């Protein structure tokens, strides 16, 4: 081979590799689309042919993002994606991500009409020391929904009050307004029930 052929071959290889993004960079782009567009998330995730080529830490993010995008698109949780994400997060000591995935798992049991499982996981997670107030508020919200569905409005009211207190503590005005509205609606229900029971 002559010098010119070698240069042409090297240029061709560089062009091919430059056009193909690494799985890690594609995953980052997909994660940036999380609050933008579900279709965009799928567009990027489908470009990752083999998730096993991602680092073990990135695999957790890949499966968790796949789970969320599928849930948002279809309205149905795919438990296997979530289990894989939780496993990867635990394997790599990614405790914060693991907590978020476990909260999603608790919510998925609610979608699957398994309220006792939602309560069990939520109670277990509420004992975690690494839990921040935002995640704690999400868990109180899940428990509130379960108690409301079971018509245990007193407990639902307690959960709504806990959420309201945390959002006020964090000075999150919008979240506080939302939590207060839920609290007041539940309070009205409890008061109606009390009036009916005294009549």
Locate the predicted segments by residue.
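A "functional boundary" signal
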Residues: 2-5, 11, 16-199
